[in-house]
Amino acid sequence: MEENPTLESEAWGSSRGWLAPREARGAPCSSPGPSLSSVLNELPSAATLRYRDPGVLPWGALEEEEEDGGRSRKAFTEVTQTELQDPHPSRELPWPMQARRAHRQRNASRDQVVYGSGTKTDRWARLLRRSKEKTKEGLRSLQPWAWTLKRIGGQFGAGTESYFSLLRFLLLLNVLASVLMACMTLLPTWLGGAPPGPPGPDISSPCGSYNPHSQGLVTFATQLFNLLSGEGYLEWSPLFYGFYPPRPRLAVTYLCWAFAVGLICLLLILHRSVSGLKQTLLAESEALTSYSHRVFSAWDFGLCGDVHVRLRQRIILYELKVELEETVVRRQAAVRTLGQQARVWLVRVLLNLLVVALLGAAFYGVYWATGCTVELQEMPLVQELPLLKLGVNYLPSIFIAGVNFVLPPVFKLIAPLEGYTRSRQIVFILLRTVFLRLASLVVLLFSLWNQITCGGDSEAEDCKTCGYNYKQLPCWETVLGQEMYKLLLFDLLTVLAVALLIQFPRKLLCGLCPGALGRLAGTQEFQVPDEVLGLIYAQTVVWVGSFFCPLLPLLNTVKFLLLFYLKKLTLFSTCSPAARTFRASAANFFFPLVLLLGLAISSVPLLYSIFLIPPSKLCGPFRGQSSIWAQIPESISSLPETTQNFLFFLGTQAFAVPLLLISSILMAYTVALANSYGRLISELKRQRQTEAQNKVFLARRAVALTSTKPAL
């Protein structure tokens, strides 16, 4: 600014009348009145100059400034020096990194004195704050694949990065569940003695007999069938519920493990959802102007190296593209006539009816496939051919996978026809796909419940004796675990088959066939909604089956590890950046919300099995009990009387009613506090707008007075 004041003055003088030309101002006059420089120093934008560097001059402070401008510059310098004298460490000054480093070197001794000053409470608070910051930095440095996620976000957008971030989060959940399972289930099982073997065929009871082991030598085809279906040698192994012996302490730890895993997953998902909600509300609100916020505030000045800089540039570019797409669609919707609006809503209603019809047909097909599986397994031809028997056992899984493979592309074709924005289209595709996947799982569980409980009729002939269908399902918990095991395994095989047989051959075809045909065959985009819903579906299957198949979280951990590297290889070798992107802020909130929905859905069959369905009489740690939960009161009765009274008090109304009242009061207080903060924020926004208007008016009046003063 000081090197060429003439050009600077001309630029200001030609901009909307804020400054008159230098010649029009004439020579300095001794008449009283504020100068233009002093008026402009009152603008909000002038205050930001103090944070750029100690040597930056205020608005209008040119090299040949008048005497009033010199006084303004002197006053401005005094304000800056006052800020420098404040007892703030260099790291807290709102300056660029280079200026803060220079300030720290000049005032190293003063920073040490400032840090050591204050009361003992202040010093402990600062020490605790710094320890907390260092702990967060250490935990952040321990996060796996941090650089890989940054690279993905820079090259393919933040939406694709959110998929891999969710995959890493789910991997953490499965690792925690596996560690808890090993500590609370496997170790007590082996420390309590060698588990007993399976019941023999000669053991009879009112609930029939149960012999899970195959007798004699078996062929390789049978071994492969047992591996893929969970039967044979795997049926009586730590993989499934029926293996664990009926020991009271083991039964309690087994049940506590299930509740602990559910609680930990709930808390971690809620924490992630709240963090994503903050970002979503900030992005969707009008508190920040989207374009200016990303252009002026999104850059990280701590980046080092050309690679990091290019990645950050790509991320900002993708975010701006999303904003521009959203703006175009909103403008088109704003200029629609009444007839166009009616036509759009009619199209939306018809398309939603089509979606409902497709979903209904898919659910009926899943129910039919599950019901026919039991009938087909009893056919002699199926029993003689292992491959055909394997196909019949996998019939529900195959049908669910087929539905999940066919219908989501149909939903993607329907969504653009409804006239929504890109973010809204993504939300509708996700909602329909998640409803398809999770509801298909619910239909499968309902069909299994119908077989286990004889359709809910406890007086039926097959269920009257033991409370469950002991003739077809002598150990129904293991059968349910086997179904979830097959779903998990088939999902992994499907992902491998799609990557190896479809995606990579398409890329090879692109290289072998130049021209339009090769480009059409090789152009692939990473479909974030489908991939995310695949993760949530797989995790929901694990939550449903982990109680009946305790090693399922460990298997899912291995699966997610393979999936991460496979998807990464597929992304960088066969996929191109998406032509249409969507907001990562909405994804960061919506994906955990759908995951929370999957956790809620998985808890329903688990809680129903624990409280209402009688456990199997021939397998599992709860055999002989009227219900799985009955083991808890029986274990409590063996505790000291004081402990019993306290635990039973927690389940009475004398404890529940005050807890409900206190929770209601705290919730009402939180809501009232949030409303008051919201009103305060609205008032501050209005005040900020008023102050800005006042300053603009005063600046214009000052310009007018300054330009007319010499003529008087």
From Swiss-Prot:
pH-related activity note: Optimum pH is 7.4 for chloride transport activity. Transport activity is suppressed at pH 5.5.
Membrane-spanning parts: 169-189, 250-270, 349-369, 395-415, 426-446, 484-504, 543-565, 593-613, 655-677
Reactions the enzyme catalyzes: chloride(in) = chloride(out)
Keyword match Transmembrane helix: yes
Cytoplasmic side: 190-249, 370-394, 447-483, 566-592, 678-712
Compartments in which it is found: Membrane
Official protein name in the record: Voltage-gated chloride channel TMC4
Organism: Homo sapiens
Lineage: Eukaryota, Metazoa, Chordata, Craniata, Vertebrata
